[in-house]
Amino acid sequence: MPMSDEPDPYIADVTALTVNALKTAASEPSVKRVVLTSSSMAAVNPAPDVPRTVTPSTWNNEVVEEAWSPSSNADRTMTIYGASKMSAEKRAWEWMEENSPAFALNSVLPNTNFGPAVDKRHAFSSTDAMLKSAYDGLADDMDSDPPRKVQL
């Protein structure tokens, strides 16, 4: 996650590091496939109860525009994160097309991951904060996110 609400240099750095990983993989003949962990924000912004179709050619240009917009909201951390994931993944696929390496690229787009905090001092500064909000009865903090359940 970005440690600033400024998109530069975070978005460019994430994109460059992603391409660098692909270049490194291409230089090693034993690499058969690369899996890029992207984000659902690379394809779409979270929008509760808004039906839509997502395809391999769906890109969240909206999040990139919002990240670079001076009129964006004050806390742009998630917006910048989403823009970095979209920019990096899109550039990765462009790089694959331009360079035709010997390996296959696959991309996964999870929406939210929960697990133990790597750094206990910052345990509630990321997605774990959503769990704490729900535990503390502040579930309204998550109203802007779509439901993470399936009714059977």
Regions flagged by a language model, labelled:
Residues 39-75:
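Active-site "gating" loop of Rossmann-like NAD(P)-dependent oxidoreductase/epimerase domains
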Residues 99-151:
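NAD(P)-dependent short-chain dehydrogenase/reductase
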Residues 1-17:
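NAD(P)H-binding glycine-rich loop region in Rossmannoid oxidoreductase-like domains
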Residues 27, 62-105:
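Active-site Tyr-X1-5-Lys
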Residues 29-33:
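A short helix->loop->beta-strand "cap" motif at the edges of active sites that frequently abuts
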Residues 4-5, 45-49, 118-120:
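Short, solvent-exposed loop/turn and secondary-structure capping segments
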